Amino acid sequence: MDIYKFAVRPLLFDLVKADPEWLHQQTMRSLSWLSHTSDRTSTKWVQNILQKSLCIEDSRLEQNLFGLRFPNPVGLAAGFDKDGVAARIWSSLGFGFAELGTVTFVAQPGNPPPRLFRLPLDQAALNRMGFNNHGAAVMATRLADEKGLFSIPIGINLGKSKVTPLEAAAEDYLNSFRLLKELGDYFVVNVSSPNTPGLRSLQDASMLSSILDVLQKENQSHKPIFVKIAPDLEWEAIADIIGLAKTYQLAGIIATNTTIRRDGLKTQVIEQTGKAPQEEAGGISGAPVRDRSTEIIRFIWQQTQGEIPIIGVGGIFTPEDAWAKITAGASLIQVYTGWIYQGPMMVSQILTGLLAKLEEHELNSISEAIGLEFKS
């Protein structure tokens, strides 16, 4: 029996009605403690228990992409470990990679609370966090102390500081990249969060090109750089970004961030505010984004004949959800909201399910499943 799903989650969500952000903060405190006391005998014992319970090791799940070895294709999406305080623990929870951030050059508190809401009827979350983080310099100091101690690839998601005007966005991203470029295995240009005023306008080809240009000129170490896009973009805008990915030799595209659309939601009223989701600002993640993000993955694969790697994220709860994104063209996938709802067993359940899918389709490795929809 999945204790989290049938006992812990109902207790926290329904009986205690714990505030989602408070619950996240307590979780991060615990994970941070485990991460930073990993040399203690007691902590090693806990990590061994976690690894035996949550980690799946199988060579069929391994991939080598953009110079990095991924032990499995399931990663932690940005937004959970904003400041990299638990970077060393994610491998013990079964993840094949983890993306830290979003981090900005200037430390910022984010938007005023309440700013994180569960929509259980929709298996979704609504957030308007606003890139709350301690800043790139603090993250750099923390990661420098732990350099070489990570057993999985660690990505860093970069955002624009709220105080920085849009016309100075390129320099803002560059300043963060300069501090962190030797400390992350890959980097993500986040221009798709709906919670920083004007940020999504940076997805425009002319604005985005100025950011990518300065980053790649600084990128002497040839670190893989991705751009993360919104699910609300029109096909023409996505095609423009694909063109930029080719021009600036990006490692790939992450599809997708949260949506600002509210159609089709079952939730009528958000309990914390007494308002309908349509009246609340922020982006929605989870199941409502699932189909659209997969459509965009499919579009990118078709437009590029699979030449640009895709990290698929949005509404992944089950092995079937993961398989759909991989066969549509995603080389890797990321989870966040699904992990909150399904609990820590979810990663191992997805990986076990993916192995079953490989056997069902008589495939030797997960890489053979990428874009399987389009292979005869």
UniProtKB/Swiss-Prot annotation:
UniProt membrane topology term: Peripheral membrane protein
Record-annotated active site: S193 (nucleophile)
Pathway: Pyrimidine metabolism; UMP biosynthesis via de novo pathway; orotate from (S)-dihydroorotate (quinone route): step 1/1
Reactions listed under catalytic activity: (S)-dihydroorotate + a quinone = orotate + a quinol
Functional summary from the UniProt entry: Catalyzes the conversion of dihydroorotate to orotate with quinone as electron acceptor.
Subunit structure: Monomer.
Name recorded for this polypeptide: Dihydroorotate dehydrogenase (quinone)
